[in-house]
């Protein structure tokens, strides 16, 4: 075991798969020589060579097309979109081609592409760099969307993503890159995609969330505990496909739920989770399921982040509304 930040765990996962499989390639803007804008690929080009870890032009559409072609020719590309706000440039390759390849070819062709990208607020970047656009890609059939909240989860999930035979969007919250360390096995391990994790057991309320909001939700759960309220925190980890069984099991146990996301409220992951709960567990509910999310505006300039982003106080306020219903 070693104490790792999330960025170190991601680097370790990439190194593991580059060693394990000569068909794994890692590339993107500034990924090679500089080791990535956040140094996630630092040292990998020197270790594995320019043919396997390399820089690309500043053109997301070209990076996506390259990954698509490599995936169809026996490689396992790990492409990086430098910030997920730039995903619009590559959506045709991702949702129009990669996601449909298995269906189009009747299972004869697949796109084993991993799309890594930083996202999320709290670090005062320009708005396009921080956008939470997971809902945009999660809506596309044929794509898995993974968002880890801890270093341990990041390594295991990324290894699983690279080994998956279909496209996986792997989103890394910038605020979590170096905010804390955690014990992470130095040997390889995997975490199954599509499986949520109960980060805190509880009996009175289910808080269902993912990414950086896991930590805000855990803070809120600590505050609720002071009032004698036992809150369960469910980390989705994979937002597409959802782990419906874990969500419903938690809600049926507690009878109350809130769903927390950093992204804007409209058409988000939280809305999908609420709909699934209402479809499958409405008779178990003792109160309406409420959401915590950002306002339906564009991501603000960095000075306004603190009033725009959801935090543990918002989670706490919403939880109390549900508990008092």
Curated annotation (Swiss-Prot):
Alphabetic keyword roster: Cytoplasm, Oxidoreductase, Pyruvate, Secreted, Thiamine pyrophosphate
Modulation of this protein's activity: Activity of the E1 module is inhibited by the pyruvate dehydrogenase inhibitor PdhI.
Cofactor: thiamine diphosphate
Primary site of residence: cytoplasm
Broad enzyme group: oxidoreductase
Record InterPro entries: THDP-binding (IPR029061), Transketo_C/PFOR_II (IPR009014), Transketolase-like_Pyr-bd (IPR005475), Transketolase_C (IPR033248)
Molecular function per GO: pyruvate dehydrogenase (acetyl-transferring) activity
Reactions performed catalytically: N(6)-[(R)-lipoyl]-L-lysyl-[protein] + pyruvate + H(+) = N(6)-[(R)-S(8)-acetyldihydrolipoyl]-L-lysyl-[protein] + CO2
Gene Ontology annotations for the cellular component aspect, listed alphabetically: cytoplasm; extracellular region
EC number assigned by the record: 1.2.4.1
Signal peptide: none
Entry's localization field: Cytoplasm; Secreted
Residues reported in the UniProt entry to bind thiamine diphosphate: 60
Pfam family, one: Transketolase_C
CDD domains, per the entry: TPP_PYR_E1-PDHc-beta_like (cd07036)
Tree of life domain: Bacteria
SMART domains in the record: Transket_pyr (SM00861)
Record text on subunit structure and interactions: Heterodimer of an alpha and a beta chain.
Function recorded in the entry: The pyruvate dehydrogenase complex catalyzes the overall conversion of pyruvate to acetyl-CoA and CO(2). It contains multiple copies of three enzymatic components: pyruvate dehydrogenase (E1), dihydrolipoamide acetyltransferase (E2) and lipoamide dehydrogenase (E3).
Family annotation (PANTHER family): PYRUVATE DEHYDROGENASE E1 COMPONENT BETA SUBUNIT, PYRUVATE DEHYDROGENASE E1 COMPONENT SUBUNIT BETA
Annotated protein name in UniProt: Pyruvate dehydrogenase E1 component subunit beta
Organism, as annotated: Bacillus subtilis (strain 168)
């Amino acid at each position: 075991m070693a104490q790792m930040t999330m960025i170190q765990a991601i680097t370790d996962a990439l190194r593991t798969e580059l060693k394990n499989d000569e068909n794994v390639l890692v590339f993107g803007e500034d990924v090679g020589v500089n080791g990535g804008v956040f140094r996630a690929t630092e040292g990998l080009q020197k270790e594995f060579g320019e043919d396997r870890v390399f820089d690309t032009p500043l053109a997301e559409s070209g990076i996506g097309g390259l990954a698509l072609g490599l995936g169809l020719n026996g490689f396992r590309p790990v492409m990086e979109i430098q910030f997920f706000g730039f995903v619009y440039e590559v959506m045709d390759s991702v949702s129009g081609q990669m996601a449909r390849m298995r269906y189009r070819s009747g299972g004869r062709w697949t796109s084993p592409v991993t799309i890594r990208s930083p996202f999320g607020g709290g670090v005062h970047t320009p708005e396009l760099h921080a956008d939470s656009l997971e809902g945009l890609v999660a809506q596309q059939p044929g794509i898995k969307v993974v968002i880890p909240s801890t270093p341990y989860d990041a390594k295991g999930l990324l290894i699983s993503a690279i080994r998956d035979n279909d496209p996986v969007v792997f989103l890394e919250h910038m605020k979590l890159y170096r905010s804390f360390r955690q014990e992470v096995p130095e040997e390889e391990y995997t975490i199954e995609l599509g499986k949520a994790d109960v980060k805190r057991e509880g009996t009175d309320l289910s808080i269902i969330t993912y990414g950086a909001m896991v930590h805000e939700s855990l803070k809120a759960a600590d505050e609720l505990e002071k009032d004698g309220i036992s809150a369960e925190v469910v980390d989705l980890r994979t937002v597409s496909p959802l782990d419906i069984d874990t969500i419903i099991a938690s809600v049926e146990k507690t009878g109350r739920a809130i769903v927390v996301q950093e992204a804007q409220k409209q058409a988000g992951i939280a809305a999908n989770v609420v709909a699934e709960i209402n479809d499958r567990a409405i008779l178990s509910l003792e109160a309406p399921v409420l959401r915590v999310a950002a306002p339906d505006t564009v991501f603000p300039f960095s000075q306004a982040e603190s009033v725009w982003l959801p935090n543990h106080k918002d989670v706490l306020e919403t939880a109390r509304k549900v508990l008092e219903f």
